[in-house]
UniProtKB/Swiss-Prot annotation:
Biased composition (Low complexity): 166-177
Organism: Saccharomyces cerevisiae (strain FostersO) (Baker's yeast)
Name of the gene: CRP1
Acidic residues composition bias: residue spans: 156-165
Alphabetical GO biological process terms: signal transduction
Function: Cruciform DNA-binding protein which exerts an enhancing effect on the cleavage of cruciform DNA (X-DNA) by endonuclease VII from bacteriophage T4.
Protein name: Cruciform DNA-recognizing protein 1
Location of the region described as X-DNA-binding in the Swiss-Prot/TrEMBL record: 160-161
Length: 465
């Protein structure tokens, strides 16, 4: 174990200077430990002092407002070259020791830091609980024996109760174990114990502007040096709430200059032109005269309205030109109807041709009796004459039909360019195509094949196809 001795010692300096710093061998004379200014105005600090042995000394010095000084309240020691320092011995440190377990904090201005005093509490009841448990065990044993002999059990119970009264301990005889009865430990020499080392924080020596206010119990009320110059201390306002609200409401209720002044200006401009009450009667008379004057004109017009309109003459009907707007409408509507008819006719003719070919190629055999058909009669001269008309008439009809076909084809090309059939319309056209009728053997035998037309009308139909 180390033979170093450690003591807590309080260094002080009287009131007067602004800043006091303690320095010595503990910080190699660097001046790193400032003293704390107390409420009285003096400077103090408590710190641990280490001594290597009993004969060793603790040398220190004070720096007061930047000047190295020596205090007269401590022992002085002259060093070589005329330097003087304060010092402490072991005897000085032992005299200042206080109760063990309490120490002072240097950073808190020498405040004590120790164990709190013991607080008194209720007496312990552990002894009572132990006695109750022992008595219960004894009684349970005695009850078991009473089953064998009731008389003996009763006597034994009385004896045991008497023994309990003599040997049992009460709470009064039990030694107190509360904190109140435990004595405090006697103070021992702190020199024998070696408490832990204290960590001393460095401080800047150039901080001369710092001021410490010695106020007991923390900061208090602030006293301003010039209270007369502050407005808050002198101005007092007595404001009536109703008057203030009325004044503010009047300021807020401002008319909106949007539509009001425009209407008023127009009215004011026309207002001088308005007549008074006497002039109004005159105006009503004038209005009545004006109405009477206008009535014959209305009567003159009424017979014209009641007269029947003249019917248009045939000359007028001829002279009326046809409207040019009707022609494009007819041209646009007709091709649509023609297209639908041609689509159905073409499909139906194709289906009929296919059916006729199938009927000719296939030989249908049925169980029905064979019927002899009547032979075709030769055509007469009158019928041939009707079929052979004049070639001039037929040529004129063919030219007209060709012209009509050309006009229809031109209209179709125009409409097809304007409107192309959509996918839905194409589907509808395909759906509208008639289904091929499958001829059953029974029905085909009964139906007769259609005769081919070789006359003039048949040739015309072929041309249209």
């Amino acid at each position: 174990m180390s033979s170093e001795l450690m003591f807590n010692y309080t260094f002080s300096w009287p009131a007067g200077p602004k800043d006091v710093i303690l320095t010595g061998t503990f910080d190699d004379w660097r001046g790193t430990l400032p003293l704390v200014k107390t409420a009285k105005g003096n400077f103090e600090i408590t710190m641990p002092v280490k001594l290597a042995n009993k004969d060793d000394t603790f040398q220190f010095k004070f720096i007061v407002d930047g000047v190295w000084c020596v205090s007269d309240s401590y022992k002085k020691e002259h060093v070589s070259e005329g330097i003087e320092n304060n010092f402490l011995q072991i005897t000085d440190l032992v005299e200042t020791q206080e109760v063990a377990g309490a120490s002072r904090i240097p950073e808190a201005g020498g405040l004590l830091c120790g164990k709190p005093p013991r607080s008194a509490g209720p007496p312990s009841t552990s002894n009572r609980k132990k006695n109750k448990r022992n008595n219960k065990k004894r009684r349970s044993k005695l009850k078991k024996k009473s089953t064998k002999n009731n008389k003996k059990s009763n006597e034994s119970l009385d004896d045991n109760e008497e023994e309990d009264g003599v040997t049992g301990t009460t709470t009064e005889d039990v030694t107190g174990t509360s904190r109140e009865e435990t004595p405090l430990a006697e103070p021992t020499n702190v020199s024998k114990e070696a408490p832990g080392n204290f960590h001393i924080l460095p401080i800047d020596q150039s901080a001369d502007t710092t001021q410490s206010n010695g106020i007991i119990g923390g900061p208090g009320p602030v006293l301003v040096p010039n209270p007369g110059e502050i407005k808050e201390f002198t101005e007092i306002r007595d404001v009536d709430a109703r008057e203030l609200n009325e004044r503010l409401n009047k300021k807020e209720e401002v008319p909106e200059p949007v539509a009001g002044p425009i209407v008023e200006s127009s009215v004011t401009e026309k207002s001088p032109a308005l007549p008074q009450a006497d002039d109004l009667i005159v105006e009503t008379k004038e209005m009545a005269h004006n109405v009477q004057e206008l009535t014959p004109q209305v009567e003159a017009v009424t017979p014209l309205i009641n007269e029947p309109e003249p019917l248009p003459t045939p000359e007028a009907q001829i002279s009326i030109p046809e409207s040019s707007k009707v022609e494009p409408v007819e041209g646009s509507l007709q091709p649509k109807l023609v297209e639908k008819r041609e689509s159905t006719e073409g499909v139906s003719d194709g289906s009929k041709k296919v059916e006729n070919k199938a009927k000719k190629d296939e030989e249908v055999f049925t169980l029905d009796p064979i019927v002899n058909k009547a032979p075709k009669l030769p055509l007469t001269d009158e019928q041939t004459a009707e079929g052979r008309k004049s070639p001039a008439v037929s040529e004129e009809k063919e030219k007209k039909k060709k012209q009509e076909k050309g006009s229809k084809e031109v209209k179709r090309s125009e409409t097809s360019k304007e409107k192309k059939p959509s996918a839905k319309e194409v589907k509808k056209q395909t759906v509208k195509a008639p289904k091929k009728q499958t001829a059953s053997p029974l029905s085909s035998s009964t139906e007769e094949p259609k005769k081919k037309k070789t006359g003039f009308f048949g040739k015309l139909k072929k041309l249209f196809k």
